[in-house]
Amino acid sequence: MQNLLPNGEWQMAAIMGLNDNEVEDICKKVKSGFVVPANYNSVGQVVISGEKEAIIEAEKIAKEMGAKKVRILKTAGPFHTEKLIESSKALRKELKNVTIHKFETKVIKNIDGEMYKDTDDVKDILARHIINPVNFTKVIQNMLNNGIDTFIEIGPRKNIIRICKKNTDK
């Protein structure tokens, strides 16, 4: 799907210390290009995604509004935004050849943090994941509300565990 990335210079940035509404307002204020929230990671941490110039402008506005930190992420695409509609369409097409079996365990959607009720809409939701923000805050809250209190991260870093800790009191 890398070959389906739109042309242009794209970036993502994590804004820390502002709430969701403040970050959404920042994105609306940006005049230099496309930028939108892409990941609602935790209370006080939202990742934005968009054109490089727009990210730079959003960073400036965020700092003026009192953001504790803005960190540019090492990415090269407008992930979790409508700019990846062609990738979403390509995935949707590929998923037509995939059989989704009944879940053996509960599965939570990144888009809204809700559990899948059945497998009927899995393919649609997977394709929508590419063009919609990740709502990790709601995912973690739903897991906690359903009695899940142990999180294991498999990977080279501990980014997800840090975000999980910010979403819990543990």
What do these predicted regions represent?
Residues R128-K170:
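Flexible, low-complexity segments
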Residues M1-N132, R162:
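Alpha/beta catalytic cores of group-transfer enzymes, especially the acyltransferase/condensing modules
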